[in-house]
């Protein structure tokens, strides 16, 4: 689950008569004071540009990949108002950039087409770009592997040629170069295939895969909740493939029909809900035998070798969390208990399939998954491992048997693993020079680049400028690509040569925002305090008291308060309409240690909301310009849930809410996410009841606008329908705004613009305009 913005608008009169219960006869809301809605029209010109430029990210380099020798950097970039990415290359020595390939050159006048499976996979990965969504470099850096409209292409950097690869018919997903660069593997119609680049012969390495029992594809919860988006892996010598078999025969099937397009077939999905059956997963190993390519070309029905199945205690550890087969290291898998309170790292013998435990992690609440580890050293002597067992994330060096060699990054150093670092935590490992590069910060509103010595654990900080820093390192450790955004700076990207510090900017064609947000990041409240972001109007008048809009997420895995200009562009536009916008990272959000995060265990319905209220009151004590008698709240996904919960449980604080794609009943969300925090429904019925919006529906006493995409395949549209139905039956006045044909990731620029406009009109109506009051600070 993830907070994502973007919604749409329909005529309000339509919802007065629709069957969703958009308007329900009930007693009028009783505000303490009548605040007349502002009559001024909403200027959406900035919003239109914001959406057309993808929040001013279009035109900025993305998916940066240094060549193995560090001589060049390849990257994707679109035009300033386009979602379509093309491929570029920066020469580090000369600083010159050249265009390598555009989608138009490949498609030659035809339109890009995505299969339903590819659309769903991109949804899981939160990829919204068109054209080239990503690419891969061959191990020697000469070839570039790309997909477009479900077809595979190889671009040769040496001669500029583009070749379409002859693959079988069907839906093609997840292509990868083999480590020796001779083959490309991929999933085709639920089975794993390999293409020989020298002969262009294709061979199936698995058979019998179907939509019900698939080979090589990660199951839904692995993609959505474990950050594992692949279901097959090459061996380091390119002679074997390990693949996942996902058996969905006992999993519930949910359908996503599009009422806006009744002639279109429903999209079905295996969707495991709390307490119900999960996908059954097992791992098999199959050989990649060059002699079979010619034989199978002659007889496409020829049998494939029977997989060597890897046994482990699947009853105790049903989740396959991580699979690693690094150069120099053994095949290693991380399996997890359904409770997510225990997981074991297993070493696999690829000749017998037998497993040996390397280490076990336990936590009374839950264990976070870090997809950066284990990271095996190339000499096979040991691996990197991260843990929170001492209360904060730490990085360890362990030997090949799993025994601790030394603590590389102590809990006090602010290490930010992948689940807390908005991306990778381990950025690069330079074994030749003996360094591990990583992200971290003692301040959770920032991320910085560090390096630690593998030999003595000495840590040094690389970046100093306030903001969010990230990097991608070349294979030889000679160069890294540094991306940075700050409180007054949109994302910038540079190639940095480590030996001499030579820094070359990757050129951007992006438009720049017309303003810098006024956002103030403060720490406030009792005890450890809460990080808050406060955005005032650019024409702020200290002698006025402003209605407040809380822009909320407040759930696991997401921080709203960060030192990055791009995070507050929409908040600034909202503030300029006559509001002060506040975001609060309370307990349960990442970046502040195990105990801070684990307080959520057992219930979503209490602590996150308490912390929003506590922080608001603390802000009001020092910022009298905040009119806490007029507070609205809005959010998306978990934030939408929090917005609805706020007006249902605390109408004394929150006077109106816009709830986007809210989870209404946690028994209708997926297993891995929900059970991590709430446990099984049979073991924690009180927690599920306490966390359900349906429990509080009869208590609604404030204006509520529910917004939801009708084709949402993450938080299904049924959540909005259930909540509206409960409110309707309780006689509670509310509004529902369905976003026709949209999923959980709403990408339509017009819809997103109109939704923000509708949100402002809603809050103007129910919160009013700034009023004279006591002087502010």
Regions found by a protein language model. Name each.
Residues 10-13, 19-470, 478-479, 487-489, ...:
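Beta-propeller folds
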Residues 1-12:
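Bacterial N-terminal signal peptides that target proteins for export
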Residues 5-7, 106, 554, 737:
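Compositionally biased, intrinsically disordered low-complexity regions
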Residues 63, 229, 252-254, 307, ...:
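Serine-hydrolase catalytic core recognition
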Residues 7-8, 426, 660, 666:
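Intrinsically disordered, low-complexity Ser/Thr/Pro-rich tracts
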Residues 4, 46, 125, 223-224, ...:
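Alpha-helical interaction segments
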């Amino acid at each position: 689950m993830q907070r994502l913005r973007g919604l749409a608008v329909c005529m309000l009169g339509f919802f007065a008569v629709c069957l969703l219960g958009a308007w329900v006869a009930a007693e009028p809301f009783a505000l303490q004071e009548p605040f007349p809605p502002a009559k001024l029209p909403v200027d959406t010109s900035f919003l239109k540009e914001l959406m057309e430029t993808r929040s001013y990210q279009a035109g900025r380099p993305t998916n940066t990949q240094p060549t193995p020798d560090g001589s060049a950097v390849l990257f994707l970039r679109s035009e300033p108002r386009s979602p379509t990415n093309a491929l570029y290359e920066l020469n580090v020595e000369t600083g010159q950039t050249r265009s390598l390939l555009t989608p138009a050159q490949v498609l030659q006048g035809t339109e890009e087409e995505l299969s339903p499976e590819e659309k769903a996979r991109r949804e899981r990965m939160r990829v919204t770009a068109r054209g080239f969504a990503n690419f891969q470099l061959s191990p020697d850096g000469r070839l570039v592997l790309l997909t477009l409209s479900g077809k595979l292409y190889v671009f040769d950097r040496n001669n500029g040629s583009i070749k379409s690869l002859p693959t079988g018919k069907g839906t093609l997903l997840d292509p990868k170069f083999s480590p020796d660069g001779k083959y490309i593997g991929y999933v085709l119609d639920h089975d794993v295939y390999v293409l020989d680049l020298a002969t262009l012969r294709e061979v199936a390495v698995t058979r019998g895969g179907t939509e019900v029992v698939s080979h090589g594809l990660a199951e839904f919860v692995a993609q959505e909740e474990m950050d594992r988006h692949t279901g097959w892996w090459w061996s380091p010598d390119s002679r074997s493939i390990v693949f996942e078999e996902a058996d969905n025969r006992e999993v519930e099937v949910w359908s996503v029909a599009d009422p806006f397009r009744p002639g279109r077939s429903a999209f079905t999905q295996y969707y495991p809900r709390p307490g119900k059956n999960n996908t059954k997963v097992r791992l098999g190993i199959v050989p990649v035998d060059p002699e079979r390519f010619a034989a199978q070309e002659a007889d496409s029905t020829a049998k494939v070798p029977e997989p060597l199945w890897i046994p482990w205690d699947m009853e105790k550890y049903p989740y396959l969390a991580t699979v690693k087969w690094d150069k120099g290291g053994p095949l290693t898998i991380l399996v997890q208990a359904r409770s997510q309170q225990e997981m074991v790292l297993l070493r696999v013998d690829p000749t017998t399939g037998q497993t040996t435990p390397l280490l076990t992690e336990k936590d009374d609440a839950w264990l976070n998954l870090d997809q950066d580890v284990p990271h095996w050293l190339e000499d096979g002597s040991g691996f990197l491992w991260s843990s929170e067992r001492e209360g904060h994330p730490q990085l360890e060096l362990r030997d090949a048997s799993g025994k601790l060699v030394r603590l590389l990054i102590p809990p006090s150093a602010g290490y930010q693993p992948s689940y807390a670092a908005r991306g990778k935590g381990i950025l690069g490992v330079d074994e030749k020079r003996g360094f591990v590069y990583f992200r971290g910060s003692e301040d959770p509103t920032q991320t910085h680049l560090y390096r630690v010595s593998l030999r003595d654990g000495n840590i040094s900080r690389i970046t100093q400028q306030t903001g969010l820093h990230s990097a991608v390192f070349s294979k030889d450790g000679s160069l890294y690509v540094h991306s940075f955004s700050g409180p007054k700076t949109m994302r910038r990207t540079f190639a940095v040569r480590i030996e001499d510090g030579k820094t070359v900017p990757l050129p951007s064609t992006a438009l720049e925002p017309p303003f810098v947000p006024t956002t103030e990041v403060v720490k406030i409240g009792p005890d450890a305090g809460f990080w808050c972001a406060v955005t005032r109007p650019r024409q702020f008048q200290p002698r006025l008291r402003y209605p407040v809009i809380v822009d909320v997420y407040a759930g696991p895995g997401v921080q709203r308060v960060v030192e990055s200009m791009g995070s507050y562009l929409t908040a600034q536009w909202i503030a300029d309409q006559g509001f002060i916008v506040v975001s609060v990272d309370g307990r349960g959000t990442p970046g502040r240690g195990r105990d801070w995060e684990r307080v959520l265990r057992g219930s979503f319905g209490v602590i996150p909301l308490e912390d929003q209220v506590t922080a608001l009151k603390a802000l009001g004590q020092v910022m009298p310009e905040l009119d806490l008698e007029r507070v609205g709240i809005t959010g998306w996904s978990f934030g939408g849930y929090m917005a609805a919960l706020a007006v249902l449980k605390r109408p004394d604080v929150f006077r109106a809410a816009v709830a986007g794609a809210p989870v209404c009943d946690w028994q209708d969300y997926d297993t891995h996410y929900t059970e991590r925090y709430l446990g099984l429904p049979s073991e924690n019925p009180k927690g599920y009841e306490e966390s359900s919006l349906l429990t509080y529906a009869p208590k609604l006493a404030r204006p509520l606008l529910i917004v939801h995409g009708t084709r949402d395949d993450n938080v299904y549209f049924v959540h909005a329908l259930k909540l509206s139905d409960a409110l309707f039956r309780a006689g509670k006045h509310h509004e529902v705004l369905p976003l026709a044909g949209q999923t959980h990731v709403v990408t339509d620029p017009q819809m997103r613009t109109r939704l923000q406009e509708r949100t402002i009109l809603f809050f103007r109506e129910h919160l009013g305009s700034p009023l004279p009051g006591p002087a502010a600070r």
